[in-house]
């Protein structure tokens, strides 16, 4: 695994952690601020790219507002994955004790 892939995986994991900590949904601005708090100063475009990838994996849903703004929500699939009961390649998984559960 390259260093770039490692950083990408960590950024996606942080997105999911931010959503978990925010009550399972948040807008892209809050997610971007959360990434910054975890040491990832990335563009809003890259945040949207990560959100879209995570949506493709079935780990979150995105509500796209008419102005293009995104609001992401965690899916039940992510909640199952967070306890390591599924496999979605190319994604780091946090220990279950670090996540809130429903």
UniProtKB/Swiss-Prot annotation:
User: What highest taxon heads this organism's lineage?
Assistant: Bacteria
Alphabetized Pfam families for the sequence: HTH_12 (PF08461)
| Protein name listed in UniProt | Uncharacterized protein HI_1498.1
Annotated organism of origin? Haemophilus influenzae (strain ATCC 51907 / DSM 11121 / KW20 / Rd)
For this protein's source organism, the top of the classification is:
Bacteria, Pseudomonadati, Pseudomonadota, Gammaproteobacteria, Pasteurellales
């Amino acid at each position: 695994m390259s260093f770039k892939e490692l950083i990408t995986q960590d950024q996606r994991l942080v997105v999911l952690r931010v959503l978990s900590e925010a009550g399972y949904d948040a807008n892209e601005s809050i997610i971007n601020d959360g990434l910054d708090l975890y040491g990832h100063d990335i563009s809003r475009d890259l945040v949207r790219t990560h959100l879209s990838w995570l949506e493709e994996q079935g780990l979150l849903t995105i509500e796209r507002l008419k102005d293009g703004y995104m609001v992401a929500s965690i899916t039940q699939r992510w909640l199952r994955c967070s306890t390591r009961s599924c496999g979605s390649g190319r994604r780091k998984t946090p220990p279950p004790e670090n996540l809130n559960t429903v």
